[in-house]
């Protein structure tokens, strides 16, 4: 497949990197290589590439905040959406957002244009494509609360539109087909009071800075919150705060964050996560689920 990609890449604007070290890209700064890493130029080229690779495994990365590639690497192609997927515009009563836009940048755009209900995105690391896929949320709002429509491309290179009603959004997940790539989303455009919007963003950022180790090498929330409970509380009450495996440690500031202290491996991160899962299950009979996506 590498030779085939090298051949077709000569006629494309998309950039291809082979045996790409994913630790350069993911926020954990850990993990293995991808056989092929592709910075996609535009939708037409993404269609071409998907048709050319056939059944060759692929995945997609946004900001790299919620992904870990195992040390053995990923024998497939990892796509990252380029600048043609990084556009926002307002059309009638909708905000049209490219999937490559960072969550925080959408919050800033909404603030500038006096659009409410997007403040929560200022507290979420990542890109809009990932936020839609996993129904990201915080501080009382989730993506499903503001989404109207999603545009995807499937593994055959076909464009498909989904309305909100067609997608079964749940806590940190959706039923979007696993073989599809989100390329854009349409959101409700509701105007609000600028000062209130700015105050909400200020409060969210303050809470985040005071409660999370945001300046460390971390992927954010490690585990999903169980129903009617909080992963961080369960982890702390299970005696896991400060627990360490190799160069990765459970944050003393927020127990649902794992921190790469220096040069942690992906296996150390995964091993520590497994220890936490076991400890919480043994104490509370609750099995935590990874919020971080692990591939390879």
Write out the residue ranges for each language-model feature:
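Short, well-ordered alpha-helical segments in soluble proteins
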Residues: 110, 128, 132-136, 151-154, ...
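Anion-binding (especially nucleotide phosphate/pyrophosphate-binding) glycine-rich loop
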Residues: 1-128
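Structural signature of FAD isoalloxazine-binding scaffolds in flavoprotein oxidoreductases
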Residues: 31-32, 38-43, 68-86, 133-164, ...
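Short acidic (Asp/Glu) patches
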Residues: 101-104, 134-136, 165-169
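Phosphate/pyrophosphate- and phosphate-bearing ligand-binding catalytic cores of soluble enzymes
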Residues: 17-18, 24, 153-274, 278-296
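Residue-level signal for beta-strand positions within conserved beta-sheet cores that form or flank
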Residues: 93, 146, 288
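A gly/ser-rich beta-alpha-beta helix-loop segment of oxidoreductase catalytic cores
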Residues: 112-148, 218
């Amino acid at each position: 497949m590498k030779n085939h990609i090298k051949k077709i890449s000569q006629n494309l604007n998309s950039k291809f990197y082979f045996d790409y070290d994913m630790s350069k890209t993911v926020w954990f700064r850990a993990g293995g290589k991808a056989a092929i890493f592709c910075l996609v130029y535009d939708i037409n080229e993404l269609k071409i590439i998907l048709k050319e690779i056939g059944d060759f495994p692929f995945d997609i990365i946004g900001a790299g905040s919620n992904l870990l590639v195992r040390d053995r690497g990923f024998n497939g192609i990892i796509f990252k959406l380029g600048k043609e997927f990084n556009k926002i515009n307002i059309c009638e009563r909708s905000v049209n957002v490219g999937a490559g836009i960072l969550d925080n940048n959408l919050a800033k755009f909404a603030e500038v244009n006096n659009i409410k209900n997007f403040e929560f995105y200022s507290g979420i690391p990542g890109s809009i494509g990932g936020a839609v896929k996993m129904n990201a949320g915080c501080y009382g709002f989730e993506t499903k609360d503001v989404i109207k429509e999603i545009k995807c491309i499937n593994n055959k290179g076909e464009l498909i539109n989904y309305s909100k009603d067609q997608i079964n959004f749940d806590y940190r997940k959706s039923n979007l087909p696993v073989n599809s790539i989100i390329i854009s989303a349409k959101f409700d455009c509701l105007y609000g009071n600028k000062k209130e919007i700015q105050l909400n963003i200020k409060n969210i950022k303050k809470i985040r800075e005071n409660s999370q180790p945001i300046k460390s090498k971390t992927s954010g929330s490690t585990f999903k919150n169980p129903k009617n409970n909080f992963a961080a509380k369960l982890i702390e009450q299970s005696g896991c705060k400060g627990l360490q495996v190799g160069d990765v440690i459970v944050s003393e500031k927020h127990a649902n964050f794992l921190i790469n202290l220096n040069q942690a491996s992906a296996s150390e991160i995964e091993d520590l996560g497994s220890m936490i899962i076991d400890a919480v299950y043994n104490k509370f009979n609750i099995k935590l689920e990874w919020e971080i996506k692990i591939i390879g």
